[in-house]
Amino acid sequence: MMSNSSSEIDVVKTRIPTYDEDDDTILYAYETKPEFVNKEPNIVSDASCNTEEQLKTVNDVLIHCQVIYDAMQNLDKKIDVIRRKVSKIQRFHARFLWANRKRYGYKKHSYRLVKKLKLQKMKKNEVYETFSYPESYSPTLPVSRRENNSPSNLPRPSFCMEEYQRAEPEEDPILSRTLSPVHPSDFSEHNYQPYYASDGAAYGSSSGLCLGNPRADSIHDTYSTDQASAAPPSVTRSPFENDGYIEKGSITKHPSTWSVEAVVLFLKQTDPLALCPLVDLFRSHEIDGKALLLLTSDVLLKHLGVKLGTAVKLCYYIDRLKQGKCFEN
């Protein structure tokens, strides 16, 4: 017999007949239903199916993780390429700035040197203001005249350079700017030839007479005829006496043979207002005649730190010097 705890739903109860008529005992046979017999194998198959699904899910997750990893690797490679390009651009920019930096020279690196240069410039300006020039030596600068530099206020007749030139028709062409163009090979061998007027006064006929040397104390656009007639020949001096560093006859040679001091004299005589500030610069760089003829505007602006207007004027005078027309108006 089956226990009472067994469920009647899970089993099949069958009555067993007895052959004893006097016995009232009833026998039953219990059998398990067929559907419950195969129940346990079904549970095992379901578990195996769940395991396969879990493995498939894990594989999918791993595949997605691999895809994400590959994408991150590609992104890192692209970032490295971008960094290399950015660094290349930065190096190119730095090299460009270094190659095109403004070369103003040494004026900005030393306060004492700048102060010294300013004082020298102020002194030169004062010297230029105290002297007058018979004509303008630059196509852009007006003629500057001295109002009154003489201690006496008496009216004095003007002295014309043309009369002086007519008195010496065979004078060296470099002595006057009003004559025709002159080639440097046509210069005379003597810088200073005294000219004696009818009253006995001597006037220097040097090349600095018409070139406006600021330190020449014997050249004026106006002067007193009484004082000139009373002055002895030894009183009037050559304008180059203060320039003791100039070799005799050096300015009359071909420009390619000029020394540094001859080039300095050329700057002073050609355009004192514009070119005299370059005297110290030319001396420090030891620019002689050959170097002067090779100067260009780029060299003056970038390497020597010369201002644009001054560089243009100097290149203009150098071109005229090459053509033999430097002293032509």
Curated annotation (Swiss-Prot):
This is Sex comb on midleg-like protein 1. Putative Polycomb group (PcG) protein. PcG proteins act by forming multiprotein complexes, which are required to maintain the transcriptionally repressive state of homeotic genes throughout development. May be involved in spermatogenesis during sexual maturation. GO terms for molecular function: chromatin binding; histone binding. Keywords: Nucleus, Phosphoprotein, Repressor, Transcription, Transcription regulation. Gene3D superfamilies: Transcription Factor, Ets-1. Belongs to the SCM family. The gene is SCML1. GO terms for biological process: negative regulation of DNA-templated transcription. InterPro entries: SAM, SAM/pointed_sf, SAM_Scm-like. The keyword Membrane does not apply. Residues 258-325 form the SAM domain. It comes from Gorilla gorilla gorilla (Western lowland gorilla). The modification Phosphoserine is found at residues 138, 238. It comes from the Eukaryota. Pfam families: SAM_1. The keyword Transcription regulation applies. GO terms for cellular component: nucleus.
